[in-house]
């Protein structure tokens, strides 16, 4: 079960983010940004909101592909000012608590956003690590570009 989680739950799990733990819950839940959690079953979220989470993904909506956190913030705010949601879903951090859950949440959220017509492109803002590169390439993404501090991958549906 995938659900968009609120700031209260985000506050309790930020410490587990291995990529961007410095981004607070206000950043993650404002300016057309959302945080999704993958739960063990459909009832876990109702009874144990911050327990039984298998994976987490943070998404920002932009109209341009960001090269770093500063551009991510700027582009999502600009998309928000237009009174519309950006058409690019940027997955800027993902982590999992169980094997295979990272892949599951990326693929499920991308499909859900695509089916709901909430985004037309699905890209990442990933760290320049071998682990991030292997994860995304192994899960069907293509490398778009490498920058000074980050790299972008794109998932197509």
Predicted regions and their residues:
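Conserved acyl-donor/pantetheine-binding loop and adjacent beta-alpha core of acyl/acetyltransferases
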Residues: 58-89
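Alpha-helix-centered segments that form part of catalytic cores
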Residues: 84-100
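Conserved acetyl-CoA-binding loop-helix of GNAT-fold acetyltransferases
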Residues: 96-115, 138
């Amino acid at each position: 079960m995938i659900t968009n989680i609120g700031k209260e739950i985000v506050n309790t799990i930020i410490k587990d983010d291995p990529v961007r733990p410095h981004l607070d819950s206000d950043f993650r839940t404002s300016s057309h940004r959302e945080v999704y959690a993958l739960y063990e079953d459909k009832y876990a979220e109702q009874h144990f909101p911050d327990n039984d989470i298998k994976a987490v993904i943070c998404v920002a909506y932009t109209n341009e592909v960001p090269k770093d956190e500063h551009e991510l913030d700027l582009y999502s705010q600009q998309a928000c000012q237009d009174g519309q949601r950006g058409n690019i879903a940027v997955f800027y951090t993902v982590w999992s608590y169980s094997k295979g859950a990272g892949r599951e949440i990326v693929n499920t959220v991308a499909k859900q956003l695509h089916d709901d017509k909430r985004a037309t492109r699905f890209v990442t803002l990933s760290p320049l690590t071998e682990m991030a590169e292997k994860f995304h390439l192994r899960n069907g993404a293509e490398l778009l570009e490498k920058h000074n501090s980050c790299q972008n991958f794109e998932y197509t549906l």
